[in-house]
């Protein structure tokens, strides 16, 4: 296919145009008074959301070159979402501000490579500063504050997540389900999560989120490799008659058997998913036995004289719901408290008997997985559109609280970054020179962008608010919800340090890439042939 090649300033300007479009669409959602964005869907009702990364994923432009700019800045949002699970809008606004200022300097003749070096050095300096400013999470009240801010100032959500973390521990599993009522409820049930995702992406039932969700499935647990589909046929036939989904957890599933399962899944014959068993050797077998106890099933192993081809329906485990993504599998079970309790006691005895620290650690991990359970948040809403929006906000809030537990909290509302701007300028003036210094100053100028946008979305003058905040002490910032200047930590307006750090690093990385672009190679749009003229109608010509 023929290509279109664009050089120098024209290339950078085309990227900038795409970046402007995406940044503006996402930035309107920032802050407590941020607005919603409506996503039109080809099928089904439109979606009304407030989540930066979801909006970014939806934007595709007609112009290929501008679309490249969109894709670049979308990456800043996606990477932040992958690392911290929140802060995607902040990352987009920061990247946009850095790119705009950087392109002005490149157009004026600055060397893009040296500018990028300055941007990278400034980013490293700021990461260290954020680490120093972070305060560890002290109690569940602080967790509730993080959840509240991340869910768009919804205190009920913040409290519920703090509750859930109290019940299942800070490392515990919190899973989201669509509820049946108008109220959002919390329930703690038996269950576990392990770090293995689906073997093939074709098992995903929700292609938008790339997740496989199985309701009331059967679970086949085996410690052998499944090579031939013939081994599975008897059990698959029994399950097909029940009409229920099936999850297979095995050491591995080889190509032929996997292909057969995928084909059956795609044709709708059987709703099936397959996952590799976690762990290695004896530890793998022990974890499979834990799952068998949890799901009230049997581990099909030749050590116990059981073969796959002879497996019966009653040997399979059951669960209320299983959610699988590319990296993890979450099992939500219920009704086996006694068996799970007995199994936990057995693991505790093994811990007492072993002298190896490594074995103790691994047994402790198994115990935590089995005893911790799963907190299920059932999302309630009046309409499906509201449900989807609430679910995205809750997901952000859960990710933000986990990030806060990991790396601590910093003052929120764009305050931390705004206060770091003078410190960065001072450090850069003392340690950098020439165009590297200009690069660092580009970052310093961009640091107030999130705060300015939060203020503008609340109807205030962003530049005035930013200057006012910079002149105050470190913890003081602008509360956009009511227009006051307050101590952010005392007011409970906090962000996880990890979210602020990830957003900044990814924004600096993307800005550096855009500034050092000198040429774009893209597909030429195909010329569509004009439709042939129709024959004239009898009785004279018509104007159309």
Curated annotation (Swiss-Prot):
ATP binds at residues 29-32, 86-90, 413, 479-481, 495. Keywords: ATP-binding, Chaperone, Cytoplasm, Isomerase, Nucleotide-binding. InterPro entries: Chaperonin_Cpn60_CS (IPR018370), Cpn60/GroEL (IPR001844), Cpn60/GroEL/TCP-1 (IPR002423), GroEL-like_apical_dom_sf (IPR027409), GROEL-like_equatorial_sf (IPR027413), TCP-1-like_intermed_sf (IPR027410). It is found in: Cytoplasm. PROSITE patterns: CHAPERONINS_CPN60. Its EC number is 5.6.1.7. Coiled coil: none annotated. It catalyses: ATP + H2O + a folded polypeptide = ADP + phosphate + an unfolded polypeptide. SUPFAM superfamilies: GroEL apical domain-like, GroEL equatorial domain-like. HAMAP family: CH60. Forms a cylinder of 14 subunits composed of two heptameric rings stacked back-to-back. Interacts with the co-chaperonin GroES. PANTHER family: 60 KDA HEAT SHOCK PROTEIN, MITOCHONDRIAL. This is Chaperonin GroEL 1. It comes from Synechococcus sp. (strain CC9902).
